[in-house]
Amino acid sequence: MFTETACASAPGDAGRPNEDLAVAGPSWVVVIDGATAPAGVDSGCAHDVAWLVARLGGALAARLSADAPAPVPTPLPGLLAAAIADTAGAHGSGCDLGNPDSPSATVALVRAAAGRLDYLVLGDSPVLLGLAGGGVRVVADDRLERLPGGRPYSLELVRRLRNAPGGFWVAAARPEAAAEAVHGSVDLRAVRAAGLCTDGVTRLVDWYGWSWDDLAAELETRGPRAAVEAVRALETARGPMRGKLHDDATAVWARLPGA
C-alpha cells in the first residue's frame, strides 16, 4: 500500500484536451499518455485520443481494483492486455481498429502486492524507483528512440513500425502489445517510492540537462507540481528541441511505508 500519492498534470495547450491521465488506488498507480495524431491524418476511428486514454485508464483501474484482493496477483502484462481488449471492445463498428493511425497511448504502471513492487512500462513514459538505500532506478522503454534513420521520423516509418517486431509498442487495439512491455518487480523493502512521468515531464532529462536523480529529488522534495512548473519554465526560456513548445505533462510520486 502507498502511504501518500501526489500528482500534477497540465495540458500542453489550454485550447485542447489534456491527453494524459493519472489514476491511482491504494496499492497501484497508472499514468497514460495519449499519442496526438498528426494534423490531417485519418485515424479511421470515431473517437479521439482523449476518449481512448479515458477508456483505457478506466479499464485498467477496474482490473487492478478487482485483482487487488487476490492472494496471487495477476501479472501486470495480463491485466494490461485485458484492459486493451476491454477498450477495443468499446469501439463501434464504424471504427477501423486495423488503421495504423488509430488512437494509441503509452502506459506506466506500478503496483504494491505480495511483498513486491511490480512495474510495467509500454512506450516512453518511464517509472522511477526511489531506492531505500538512496538513488534512483529508471525503468524505461526507449524503442521509439531507436527507430531506423533517426529523427525526425517519417509518418510512413511510424505507421510501419508501430506495434511491429523491430519497432515500438503502444496500447492501441492489439492486446498482444502488453506482452512487449518492459516489466518486472523488486522487493518492496528495497523501494521507498515510485515516480511515474509522461514525456512532457521527462523533457527535463531528455532536453534540459537534468539527471534522473535530479528529477526524482524534485518529485520527492517539492512534488509533482514543481516538476511540471520547472519544465514549463525551461520550455518558455529555451524553447523545444523539436516539435511543439509545450506537451501535456504529468507526474506522480507515490510513497511507500518507511519513506
Language-model regions, residue ranges each:
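PP2C/PPM-type serine/threonine phosphatase catalytic domain
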Residues: 1-259
